[in-house]
UniProtKB/Swiss-Prot annotation:
Record keywords, A-Z: Activator, Nucleus, Transcription, Transcription regulation
Gene Ontology cellular-component terms listed: mediator complex
Record protein name field: Mediator of RNA polymerase II transcription subunit 5
One Pfam family per UniProt: Med5
InterPro entries found in the cross-reference section: Mediator_Med5_fun
PANTHER family reported for this sequence: MEDIATOR OF RNA POLYMERASE II TRANSCRIPTION SUBUNIT 5
Gene symbol of the encoding locus: nut1
Subcellular location as annotated: Nucleus
Domain of life: Eukaryota
Segments forming a coiled coil: none
Organism: Neosartorya fischeri (strain ATCC 1020 / DSM 3700 / CBS 544.65 / FGSC A1164 / JCM 1740 / NRRL 181 / WB 181)
UniProt family annotation: Belongs to the Mediator complex subunit 5 family.
Record bears the keyword Mitochondrion: no
Length: 1009
C-alpha cells in the first residue's frame, strides 16, 4: 500500500470514527514515523477523502488541517494552494439540460471559508509567516484564490437579475470577504511589509495589483471598511497591476510608506477599559432626538465592546440606561424626552435581553446582574417607596425600578419572587399580563377595534410595547398588501394623534419598516371614477398620508428613511412640490379642469359634490392644494372674491376627509405671508381662521391638532419675522398664541436656544471649550465607576450642535488634544473609550448609511443611502492618513490618533457574513470533546509511545483500522481525556458566539495592524 493510499485510509477512518483533534495529532505522529509523505501529497490525500464523502460541511476537516499546520507538517501557503485545487469555486453554472450530471461533485465552500479563516488567525497572531519566502508563497496563493472567486462571479453574473454573480451565494460572499481580510492581515505583518517594500519582488506586486483591481470593485457591495483598507494598501505600495516606472522618487515614497507602517506597528495598545461614561454617552445619543435604535447595529456594537462577557454587557447597559434617566431628571429634560428614556429602559431592554439570551447557549444570572446595576445607582434619584415620603425633592422616577423589574419578570428574565429582594421592600404593583405578538395579530384580525385598544397601551410602562408594535406593524403590512384601507385608516388615525407612541415605535422599528408599505400604497392608489362614494376614499387616503407626514415631520425624515425609492413616487413629488403653487399656464388640461371644479365647489356651489371628487383622485387633489390656495387668495386680494366667501370655502378643508391637505395649504400660506411685500391682512385673517377655527367637529379636532403639530414650528418662525417687519400689527400674536402648544412636536436632537447660548459663551473657549469641559467631567466620573453617585450633566445635543454648526473637522481636534492630555495624566484607556464612543455614537444624518452596512439595500431596487455631512469618523480617517507627518512633530499625538483609529474601527467592525449555517448544531458541536476548535501547545506534545505497540506497518491497512477503533473506544470510555485546550475556545467564544457564528471566526481586521 503506497503512502498516499495509507494516508487516505487513515483520514477516511478518522472522519468515520469522529476522532478529535488531539487524538488525530497523536495518531498521525505515529503514521508519520512509519509512512513519511510530502506535504502536497498529504493534503491531496486529505482533500480527496473529503471529495469522496461528498459531505457539504464537516467541521473535522478544518481541524485536521489546522492540526497539521501546528505540527509543522504543512505550510499555510501549501494549504491554500491545495485547497483551491479541490475547491468547488471552479464549478461553472449548470444549464437546465445538464441537471444532475455533476451530482458527484463535492461542495467545498464552507470548508474553504473555515480553513482560510484559520489562516487569518494564524497570520494575525504572528504564527506565520516566519520567512519572506513563505510570505511570498501565501501572497501568490491569495492571488490565485481572488482570481478564482472573480471568475466564479463573472460566470454566474446575469445583468437581468437583481441578485446574481457573487451576491447570489452567501457562501461565496463570505469566502470573498475572508480572502480580503487574510490579504489585509498578511500585508500588515513584518514579513509581509518586507516583501511589499522590497524592489526585488516587482513581479509579485504586479500580480497582486491585478488581483486587487479585480477584487476592489466587487468589495463595495460586501464591506466598505475592508475595501477602504485594501484601497489604502493599493495606494501605499502602488499595486495597480503595472510595473512601476523607474524614478528617483519611488524609493523615497516606498521608504515613507514603510516608515508610516512601521510607526503604526510600533504603537502598542494599552488595556481596553469599558468606561461607565461610554454607554452613558451612547444611549444618550440614541435617544436624545429621533430614536436611533437598530437591534442588529446595537448587538454588533455591544458584541465588539464586550465580546462574550454577557454579564458585564447586561450590567453596564442597565446602569447606563438608569444613569441617562437620572441625568435627564437633574437637567430638567422635557417630559417627552424623559418618556423616551423611560420607555427604552422599561419596554426595550427587557425584550432586548430576552431575545439576546434566547439566541445564545450561555446561562446568565440575570438577578445578580440586575442587583449589581441597581447597587450603582444614585439612591436620591431612584428612591424606594418608603423613602419617597421622607424626600422633599423630585420623586418622578420613584416607580422606575419597579416598572423595570416587573417588565423583566414578564419576559421571564427573573422570577416574580425575586422582585421583592431586588427592591428591598414589598412592590406596590402586580405582574402585568405579558403579550405575545402572534396572539395579538390574531386578536386584531378577529376584532379590528382591538388595534386601537393596543395602541393606547404603547405608552404604558409594562414591557409590552415591543409585542404591540410588532403586531400593529405586521397587521398594517397585511392591510397594505390586501388594500383593506378602511381598517388601516383607523389604525393610522390612532397612531398619528399619539406623538409619543410614534417615539416608541422607532425604539422597536426603523421608519422604513413602518412607512415603506404605506408610501407604496399611496403611490399605487387605485382610483375608479365609477366606484360610488368618494368621500370615504378621500378620508382613508388622507388618514394614511397624515401618518406618513407625522413621522416625516416629527423626526425630520428624508425620502430614503420613508422607503421611497422611485423618482416617480407620488409621496416624493408631494413632499418636494406639494407646498409650491403653479401658474395656470403650467397646468395641463386635466389639472385646469380639476382646479376649476374645486374652486366652484368651495366658493360657488353649496358644497363639495361627489362629481367633483369623482373627477379628481386624492393624489391629483393634494398636488393642487397650494395652487388652489394661491388662486383663491389672489382673487380675494384683488377684490374678485369676498373674504367671508373665501373663509367659508376654506372651512370645507376642516372636514376630516380633507383636513390633512391643510398641511400643504398652511405651509404655502406661511410662505406667502413671509414673502409678500403687500399688506398681509387678508392672508393673516385666512391663517387665523384655519389655525383657530370658530367651530370644528370632535373627530376633526384630533386631526387638526396633528396638522398644527406638523406646521407650527415653520409658521412661528415666519410670523415672528413678519412681526419684526410690522411691529405695530396686533393680528399676529393671537395666531402665535394658538400655535404655541404645538411647537414642541419635532424630535430631532436640536438644541434649545438657552442651551446654545450657554455653550457658545463658555469661558473656556466657546462651544468647543464646552465640549472639552464635558469630556473632562465624564472621564473624572468614570474613574470611580462603582460609586453610587449621580452622573455628570450631559446631553448629546452639545456634540450634535458642534458638528452641525462648526463641522466635524473643527470638533475632532480639541477632542484629540483632550485625549492626549488625559493620556499624559494617566487616564488614557478611560479617555480613549470615551472619545471612541463619541465618534461611534449614532447621528440622524448618518444613521441610514450605518444601517446599510448591516442590512444592505438592493442597489437595483433602491438608491444607496448617502451621508450629507462630514462625520467625526471621516475626519478621524483623514487625520489618520497624516500620522507619518504628525509623528515627526508630535509623536504622542500620533500615537493617540493611531489608538483612537483602531478603537473606533474595532467598535464598529461589521459582523462577518456567514449565512446558511445551523448555528444550534454548530454550537452543540463546539461543546463536544470530539469537535474542538483548537488544541493548546502543551497538549499537542502527547506521548505517542503507548500507542506504538499497535505497529502500523506501511502496508497494513488493518493496523490503521485497529488503531482508529482503539482510539475511538478510548475516547468513548474517558470523555475527560479529549485533550482540548479551552484557551482557544475562549478566544473564539469571545469573538464569535456573541454574534451567533461560533464556527466561523470573525476577526477584528483593525487589530491585525
Amino acid at each position: 500500500m503506497t503512502a498516499p493510499v495509507q494516508w487516505r485510509t487513515f483520514f477516511h477512518q478518522c472522519l468515520i470514527h469522529r476522532i478529535d483533534a488531539s487524538e488525530f495529532r497523536n495518531l498521525s505522529k505515529l503514521l508519520f514515523q512509519k509512512c513519511p509523505i510530502a506535504e502536497s501529497a498529504l493534503l491531496d490525500a486529505l482533500l480527496q477523502t473529503r471529495s469522496e464523502s461528498r459531505i457539504k460541511w464537516d467541521p473535522l476537516l478544518p481541524l485536521y488541517i489546522d492540526c497539521l499546520c501546528r505540527m509543522g507538517r504543512v505550510r499555510t501557503s501549501t494549504v491554500l494552494t491545495s485547497l483551491l485545487k479541490y475547491s468547488s469555486i471552479h464549478d461553472k453554472p449548470q444549464l437546465p439540460t445538464s441537471e444532475g450530471k455533476d451530482g458527484s461533485k463535492c461542495y467545498t465552500l464552507m470548508t474553504d471559508i473555515r480553513v482560510i479563516q484559520d489562516a487569518m488567525l494564524s497570520v494575525s497572531t504572528g504564527s506565520t509567516p516566519k520567512t519572506n519566502a513563505e510570505a511570498i508563497a501565501i501572497f501568490f496563493a491569495i492571488i490565485d484564490w481572488i482570481h478564482a472567486v472573480a471568475s466564479w462571479h463573472n460566470s454566474h453574473f446575469d445583468p437581468g437579475q437583481h441578485s446574481s454573480g457573487m451576491m447570489s451565494s452567501p457562501d461565496v460572499v463570505s469566502l470573498f470577504e475572508s480572502l480580503g481580510i487574510l490579504l489585509a492581515a498578511l500585508s500588515g505583518t513584518g514579513k509581509g511589509l518586507e516583501v511589499l517594500s522590497a524592489d526585488s519582488h516587482e513581479g509579485l506586486k504586479v500580480k497582486l495589483g491585478q488581483a486587487l483591481s479585480a477584487y476592489l470593485p466587487l468589495c463595495v457591495e460586501v464591506s466598505l471598511p475592508l475595501r477602504n483598507r485594501l484601497d489604502g494598501l493599493q495606494k501605499e505600495f502602488n499595486l495597480y497591476g503595472e510595473r512601476a516606472p523607474k524614478s528617483l522618487d519611488v524609493p523615497m515614497m516606498e521608504n515613507m510608506n514603510v516608515n508610516a507602517l512601521q510607526f503604526e506597528a510600533s504603537v502598542m495598545d494599552g488595556p481596553v477599559i469599558n468606561s461607565r461614561a461610554g454607554l452613558y454617552v451612547f444611549i444618550n445619543a440614541m435617544l436624545v432626538g429621533r430614536p436611533l435604535v437598530d437591534d442588529s447595529m446595537l448587538i454588533n456594537y455591544l458584541a465588539n465592546r464586550y465580546g462574550g462577557h454577557y454579564e458585564a454587557l447586561i450590567e453596564e447597559i442597565l446602569t447606563a440606561a438608569f444613569d441617562v434617566l437620572s441625568n435627564g431628571m437633574y437637567r430638567n429634560e422635557s417630559s417627552r424626552t424623559m418618556f423616551v428614556f423611560r420607555s427604552f429602559l422599561v419596554n426595550k431592554l427587557p425584550a432586548f435581553f430576552a431575545a439576546m439570551l434566547a439566541s445564545t447557549m450561555v446561562s446568565i444570572p440575570m438577578e445578580m446582574c440586575i442587583s449589581h446595576a441597581l447597587s450603582r445607582l444614585d439612591p436620591n434619584t431612584f428612591p424606594s417607596f418608603s423613602q419617597m415620603f421622607e424626600m422633599q425633592g423630585n420623586t418622578v422616577l420613584s416607580d422606575v425600578r419597579q416598572e423595570f423589574l416587573f417588565a423583566c419578570a414578564s419576559h421571564k428574565l427573573i422570577p416574580e419572587s425575586s422582585i421583592e429582594r431586588l427592591l428591598g421592600e414589598n412592590p406596590m404593583q402586580t405582574l402585568p399580563v405579558g403579550y405575545n405578538k402572534d396572539e395579538l395579530v390574531s386578536q386584531i384580525n378577529a376584532n379590528p377595534e382591538r388595534a386601537e385598544q393596543l395602541i393606547n397601551e404603547i405608552e404604558s410602562m409594562e414591557g409590552n410595547a415591543g409585542a404591540i408594535i410588532g403586531a400593529i406593524t405586521e397587521v398594517m403590512h397585511n392591510l397594505c398588501n390586501q388594500k383593506e384601507t378602511m381598517t388601516l385608516k383607523n389604525i393610522c388615525n390612532s397612531l398619528s394623534r399619539r406623538p409619543q407612541a410614534l417615539d416608541v415605535v422607532l425604539i422597536f422599528r426603523n421608519p422604513k419598516q413602518v412607512l415603506q408599505p404605506l408610501c407604496a400604497l399611496l403611490d399605487s392608489w387605485h382610483w375608479d371614477e365609477d366606484q360610488g362614494e368618494y368621500q370615504p376614499v378621500y378620508d382613508e387616503f388622507g388618514s394614511i398620508l397624515l401618518l406618513v407626514l407625522a413621522f416625516k415631520y416629527r423626526f425630520d425624515l428624508r425620502p430614503a428613511d420613508l422607503g421611497i425609492s422611485s423618482n416617480d413616487s407620488f409621496v416624493l413629488r408631494l413632499l418636494e412640490r406639494g407646498t409650491c403653487s403653479q401658474k395656470l399656464d403650467a397646468l395641463d388640461e386635466k389639472q385646469n379642469k380639476n382646479l376649476g371644479s374645486w374652486i366652484a365647489a368651495l366658493f360657488i356651489a353649496e358644497g363639495i359634490s361627489e362629481e367633483t371628487m369623482s373627477a379628481c383622485s386624492p393624489q391629483e387633489f393634494y398636488l393642487l392644494v397650494a395652487t388652489l390656495f394661491s388662486q383663491s387668495l389672489e382673487a380675494c386680494e384683488t377684490g374678485k372674491l369676498e373674504f367671508d366667501t373665501l373663509k367659508g370655502g376654506f372651512e370645507y378643508l376642516l372636514e376630516p376627509f380633507l383636513l390633512p391637505s391643510l398641511i400643504f395649504a398652511l405651509t404655502w400660506l406661511g410662505d406667502h405671508i413671509w414673502e409678500t411685500e403687500l399688506d398681509p391682512s387678508i392672508p393673516l385673517k385666512a391663517l387665523q381662521s384655519l389655525v383657530n377655527p370658530s367651530s370644528i367637529s370632535g373627530e376633526a379636532r384630533e386631526i387638526h391638532r396633528t396638522v398644527l403639530n406638523i406646521t407650527a414650528r415653520t409658521l412661528e418662525e415666519q410670523l415672528k419675522d413678519v412681526r419684526t417687519r410690522h411691529p405695530s400689527r396686533t393680528d399676529i400674536k393671537p395666531i402665535l398664541d394658538s400655535l404655541e402648544p404645538c411647537l414642541s412636536f419635532q424630535l430631532v436632537g436640536s438644541s434649545h436656544r438657552s442651551e446654545l447660548e450657554s455653550w457658545t459663551t463658555h469661558s473656556g473657549g466657546g462651544l468647543l471649550g464646552g465640549i472639552r469641559s464635558t469630556f473632562q467631567s465624564l472621564v473624572l466620573w468614570s474613574t470611580n465607576p462603582e460609586v453610587s453617585m449621580a452622573p455628570p450633566p450631559y446631553t448629546h445635543r452639545q456634540l450634535i450642535a458642534g458638528v452641525r454648526m462648526l463641522g466635524a473637522s473643527r470638533v475632532l481636534p480639541p477632542l484629540i488634544e483632550e485625549l492626549k492630555l488625559q493620556t499624559e495624566a494617566g487616564n488614557g484607556p478611560l479617555a480613549l473609550d470615551l472619545a471612541a464612543t463619541l465618534i461611534c455614537a449614532p447621528m440622524a444624518e448618518t444613521f441610514s448609511v450605518e444601517q446599510n452596512s448591516h442590512q444592505p439595500v438592493d442597489p437595483n431596487k433602491e438608491a444607496l443611502p448617502r451621508c450629507g455631512i462630514l462625520t467625526l469618523r471621516d475626519v478621524l480617517a483623514l487625520q489618520h492618513e497624516n500620522v507619518p507627518k504628525i509623528s515627526e512633530k508630535d509623536p504622542l499625538r500620533a500615537e493617540v490618533l493611531v489608538r483612537l483609529y483602531r478603537r473606533v474601527n474595532a467598535l464598529l467592525a461589521p459582523p462577518s457574513q456567514v449565512p446558511n449555517l445551523d448555528v444550534n448544531n454548530i454550537i452543540q458541536n463546539m461543546q463536544l470533546g470530539g469537535v474542538g476548535v483548537g488544541v493548546g501547545a502543551g497538549q499537542m506534545e502527547l506521548d505517542a509511545a503507548g500507542a506504538a505497540d499497535h505497529g502500523v506497518g506501511p502496508d497494513d491497512a488493518e493496523n490503521i483500522h485497529r488503531m482508529i477503533d482503539n482510539a475511538a473506544a478510548a475516547a468513548a470510555l474517558d470523555s475527560s481525556g479529549t485533550g482540548l485546550d479551552t484557551s482557544i475556545d475562549d478566544v473564539l467564544n469571545a469573538a464569535d458566539m456573541a454574534v451567533g457564528n461560533p464556527e466561523f471566526l470573525d476577526l477584528d481586521m483593525e487589530g491585525m495592524f
